[in-house]
Amino acid sequence: MSVTPIVEVKHLEKEFGFWRKNRILKDVNFAIMPGEFHAFIGQNGAGKTTTIKCLISSYQRFKDEINIDGISNKNAKSKGVISYIPEYAVFPKHLNTHEYLYTLGKLSGCSLQTIKEKVDYWLARFQIEHLRFKKPNDFSSGQKKKVLLIQALFNDPKLLIMDEPTANLDPKTRNEFMDVCYELNVRNKMAVFVSSHILAELENYCDSLTVIHEGEILFNGKTKNIAKDNFGYRLKVNNSDSLRKWLKAQKIAYKYFPATDDFQVDLKQKQSNKFAVELYQQPDFEVFIFARQGNSLQNIYNNLIEQYEYDQVQRAVAIREQDEAV
């Protein structure tokens, strides 16, 4: 029996502008399964926030389909499944923390008893009970994010969406915040969707990810799969053409990244020692770098971006050659 994705995005496109259209999202497709801790990663301007605003229906005009737990996000019922924490916290200036949380709890349809239990528990858990009757608009970034998380948990969401949740947080607060989200993911089977460009902080939490770059999806799936596919050795020499010929003669698959003029080769453990000895014995080039690549999200991300840029260059060359041939 197939499992319905908690998030399913099909052929999403989003443009801005009236006379001159600026296409931000280009045929975006990805899915998140129930209970996953999912990282949505990309550099600033890649389209992360635009995608999230389409998911939560902040943007109404976009092309094609978004489903939340099998329900179109244009259907009001889909809103009961999700909670959202924006990158920047904005609070009414006239409400204190107690008033703000009780108001949002009522709007979420919770009973006063449920609101009291949740507010009391989470204020104590986050050690901010002393801020109950102070205005969150005046809090530090970390304290504001804690209040937003308490608010987001009123409706017991199946999916928690967070846009750059740890931006401007100190390391201690950042770890505390992410640890709580991970606990909710494991204990409540709540799917967590985190947009970030700080990859190191997601390393210990996420089990799946989507990589977006210049409005296009480069990867969507389990981290263990992409880690396996991108594991290898980084190789840089003083004569790339000679190295390329030697690798072909050895029948060793490689990827070449012209932006940095280096190579990635995938080797089995038993191959690596023999390969290294023969590599350093070659007279036609000098080895500058021969280093094993780790399976960190940063290395995975770098490899995907380098491959994307290489493909773009190759595509541009092919188009130019076709034009010249006409």
From Swiss-Prot:
Source organism of this protein record: Mycoplasma pneumoniae (strain ATCC 29342 / M129 / Subtype 1)
Keyword Transport: yes
A molecular function (GO) term: ATP hydrolysis activity
Listed Pfam families: ABC_tran
Signal peptide start-end: none
Taxonomy, superkingdom: Bacteria
Name of the protein described by the UniProt record: Putative ABC transporter ATP-binding protein MPN_334
Residues annotated to bind ATP: 42-49
Keywords recorded for this protein, A-Z: ATP-binding, Nucleotide-binding, Transport
Family designation: Belongs to the ABC transporter superfamily.
PROSITE patterns registered for this protein in UniProt: ABC_TRANSPORTER_1, ABC_TRANSPORTER_2
Domain ABC transporter: 7-239
